[in-house]
Amino acid sequence: MKKAYVKSYGCQMNAYDAGRMADVLAAEGYSATDTVEEADVVVLNTCHIREKAAEKVYSELGRLRVLKGDRAESGQETRIVVAGCVAQAEGREILSRAPAVDVVVGPQSYHRLPDLLRQSRETRVVDTEFPAEDKFDHLPARRNRGVTGFLTVQEGCDKFCAFCVVPYTRGAEVSRSVAAVVEEARRLVEGGVREITLIGQNVNAYHGDGPDGAPATLGQLMDALSAVPGLLRLRYTTSHPNDFADDLIAAHATNPLVMPYLHLPVQSGSDRILHAMNRRHTGDAYRRLIERIRNARPDIALSSDFIVGFPGETDADFAETLRLVSDIGFSAAFSFKYSPRAGTPAAEREDAVPEAVKTERLAALQDLLDRQRHAYNAASVGTLTEILVEKTGRHPGQVAGKTPHLQAVQFDAPASTIGTVVPVRITRAGSNSLFGEALEGAAAAA
């Protein structure tokens, strides 16, 4: 049987897309492999959000060129595919920089992958069009991959933040219909998935057709999903502060499947920098939004994204970011040094922050965020929480799962608990996960 190796870089949507590409190849007779050396088709599903991520792809392609040559010497064919956002952004340039690549395919065209592979036997192929047809209508049924799963409900972004390539690589905001999302969710649950994370570049801008043909909100979509038998938990990511509707806030209080966790990027605490980033909100507007969300769900865990060293950022601007972090308190966060991306407005600016200053600011921010994360996890010790068991743990007799607040937890229980919710008393907080004990009889009953 032919074998396919699919590697994904970057965001959760890339992980979803990588899985769907594996499904497309499986329908063509390819079995999945984790060993690139034995693959007949190698797919790199790429991320273009930062320069470092893009350069990783070219480094990997250099290694794959050698592998392709070695396999050819033994009479084995290898097709190399570059997919995702680097493919969309750089197109034919990839063929120039990486001679071993056979197919370049953008994120809106990967349902065509089998045809592109066939075409590549005659000539190298680039497909970075935004086709009129909905790719989701052309994808095969999803295969079961575990207890949790991603489900794309929205793609693209209309916000045009000054630092971001997503509007150029993923296109304008489009949403799938409620019926299509519910049907895919139903199939996932039938395959064993118990927790679904709804994903989109700007997921709370969701506006897919509802049952009556009118645009539905993300809150309404989650209400519809809560009726899927066997579905236990719902999450969503990534959101924009400007698209947080009242009914989405209310869903955190009224829909029992919506978990008390929210990833809501803010990027900076400085109003001056937020304006330069074209974020269209202020630091205080973000604070007020968080206050409203916490009023609806007081125990909600918050995470965010931050960029340090955006062009023109001063010490005073950075101090405002630290103040916002201190004011709000996060359970987790992702923080990065600004990386210019060709074609974005910020890349044209001439007031770059020195690399050494970026490094210093990132270290200070991450120190504060790490202290908040450790304090948040330490506060969980002694509490009783419900763990959705996802897999076996690191040690024999151990399983691992997540709290409603998306904290990783390990505890002793049989593998038969995988896919069930087990009440667990948290006994210890480690550096990256929590440890606990299942309530007596709970694990056995599961």
From Swiss-Prot:
PROSITE patterns: MTTASE_N, MTTASE_RADICAL, RADICAL_SAM, TRAM
Listed SUPFAM superfamilies: Radical SAM enzymes (SSF102114)
E.C. numbers: 2.8.4.3
Binding site for [4Fe-4S] cluster 1: 11, 47, 85
Annotated catalysed reactions: N(6)-dimethylallyladenosine(37) in tRNA + (sulfur carrier)-SH + AH2 + 2 S-adenosyl-L-methionine = 2-methylsulfanyl-N(6)-dimethylallyladenosine(37) in tRNA + (sulfur carrier)-H + 5'-deoxyadenosine + L-methionine + A + S-adenosyl-L-homocysteine + 2 H(+)
Cofactor(s) listed: [4Fe-4S] cluster
Keyword line: 4Fe-4S, Cytoplasm, Iron, Iron-sulfur, Metal-binding, S-adenosyl-L-methionine, Transferase, tRNA processing
Domain MTTase N-terminal: 2-122
Cofactor note: Binds 2 [4Fe-4S] clusters. One cluster is coordinated with 3 cysteines and an exchangeable S-adenosyl-L-methionine.
Domain Radical SAM core residues, every copy: 143-375
Key word Iron-sulfur present: yes
Cellular compartments annotated: Cytoplasm
Enzyme kind, highest EC tier: transferase
Entries under Pfam families matching the protein: Radical_SAM, TRAM, UPF0004
GO CC terms of this entry: cytosol
Main location: cytoplasm
Residue ranges annotated for the TRAM domain, each copy included: 378-440
PANTHER family the UniProt entry points to: CDK5 REGULATORY SUBUNIT-ASSOCIATED PROTEIN 1, MITOCHONDRIAL TRNA METHYLTHIOTRANSFERASE CDK5RAP1
Protein family per UniProt: Belongs to the methylthiotransferase family. MiaB subfamily.
Subunit text: Monomer.
Name used for this protein in its record: tRNA-2-methylthio-N(6)-dimethylallyladenosine synthase
Organism (species): Methylorubrum extorquens (strain CM4 / NCIMB 13688) (Methylobacterium extorquens)
Lineage: Bacteria, Pseudomonadati, Pseudomonadota, Alphaproteobacteria, Hyphomicrobiales
